[in-house]
Regions:
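C-terminal catalytic/motor cores of large multi-domain enzyme assemblies
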Residues: 1-286
Length: 286
């Protein structure tokens, strides 16, 4: 409330136009832009084979998530979100994705959210992703999100509606408990969908109005003709301008196609300047 949230820092040092934009486009899905990138598979395949000879196993999902984490760390404005007309800088980097317990029509899904610092190497990202998949792929496995969802479904429909409206109201006003924010996969820096793993095409996935998701990445099966993997990206335009997005996403593509750069940690994290110097737009010009 009053600009305070346990999961974010209010960004004050923004220009007037950017401050007004969230009040013009109040809904996240009304402010979403979409773009398409084709990533060359050849350098990824060469890298994966070379690492396999050294005893390290990687896949495209590992590289994509590691690239997103590194890209957000290098371009911290990507890690902002809009809530109740205000722009916040997120505390921590979070990636959410779905784990399918079995590849059949009746198998259930688990929603997983992982936290990163931005310093991680590709190996550290891989280990964290693989552990989450192993822990949640078991049929009997239930993470905290699964347990909370199951508990809510035991309530009558009218009660569930009231509870969800209350949670959304609390979220808008910064009153939602931090334990729920940590549990919610919808309060995340980016959602990732690996449709390539089920031989599906990439899609433009909408941004969720509930929560704070600002980016959605979906990668699909590579083309047999061009040997390129499609990656569709949907983004909230309210907290970043086009110039910043283009630079950041081009860097992400470069990292994806040069994954060896992700083997070394990022020692220094760039600051979100408008958070570090919140009153720079109000400083007196000499």
């Amino acid at each position: 409330m009053f600009g305070y949230r346990p999961d974010g820092i209010l960004v004050r040092g923004i220009d007037p136009i950017q401050k007004i934009i969230p009040h013009i486009m109040t809904l996240r899905y009304d402010a979403q832009n979409m773009t398409h990138y084709d990533c060359e598979c050849a350098p990824l395949d060469v890298f994966i084979r070379e690492q396999e000879q050294k005893g390290e196993r990687f896949n495209y999902m590992h590289i994509l998530i590691a690239g997103i984490v590194r890209g957000i760390a290098l371009y911290p404005r990507l890690n902002r979100f809009v809530m109740n007309g205000r722009i916040f800088a997120r505390k921590g980097i979070f990636i959410s994705f779905v784990v399918k317990k079995r590849l059949n029509f009746t198998a259930s899904d688990s929603l997983v959210k992982l936290e990163f610092t931005g310093h991680e190497t590709l190996l550290e990202v891989r280990d964290k992703v693989d552990r989450a998949i192993i822990d949640n792929a078991r049929t009997e496995a239930n993470n905290n999100t699964d347990k909370a969802a199951r508990l809510l479904t035991f309530t009558p429909n009218i009660v569930l509606k009231i509870l969800m409206r209350l949670i959304k109201w609390m979220d808008r006003h910064g009153l939602i408990p931090n334990v729920l924010l940590k549990m919610s996969p919808f309060h995340t820096s980016a959602f990732v969908s690996n449709l390539k793993s089920i031989k599906g095409p990439s899609i433009y996935h909408h941004l969720y109005e509930f929560g704070t998701t600002g980016l959605f990445f979906a990668m699909g099966k590579e083309s047999a003709d061009t040997h390129r993997m499609p990656v569709e990206i949907v983004m909230d335009e309210r907290f970043c301008d086009g110039f910043y997005y283009v630079r950041a996403l081009n860097e992400l593509k470069r990292l994806m196609e040069n994954p060896q750069q992700l083997l070394t940690p990022l020692e220094t994290l760039p600051e979100d300047v408008e958070v570090a110097d919140p009153y720079r737009f109000f400083a007196c010009k000499k």
